[in-house]
Amino acid sequence: MGRGGGMGNPVNVGIAVQADWENREFISNISLNVRRLFDFLLRFEATTKSKLASLNEKLDILERKLEVLEVQVGSATTNPSVFN
């Protein structure tokens, strides 16, 4: 005959509690690592945007300088007396 309404074997309950704590710890570690990854990605995005904006400004400056040089070369080829 079995016992009715009991909590079951104390060893099984202890194993279940231990497994539950291990699962909670695992989930906590996963959550922490996901949060760290998310924080890293936010910082990476901000840094990347900043660096790309800086590079874009430098590229704009170089493009303007190139346009000026193209105009100077064009006027020099049509008017060689500029170099005399």
From Swiss-Prot:
One of its GO terms (cellular component) is plasma membrane. Binds SCAR. GO terms for biological process: actin filament organization; cell motility; regulation of actin polymerization or depolymerization; trichome morphogenesis. This is Protein BRICK1. PANTHER family: PROTEIN BRICK1. Expressed in expanding leaves, embryos, ear primordia, and roots. Very low expression in mature leaf tissue. It comes from the Eukaryota. Belongs to the BRK1 family. Promotes multiple, actin-dependent cell polarization events in the developing leaf epidermis. Involved in regulation of actin and microtubule organization. Part of a WAVE complex that activates the Arp2/3 complex. Keywords: Coiled coil, Cytoplasm, Cytoskeleton. It is found in: Cytoplasm, Cytoskeleton.
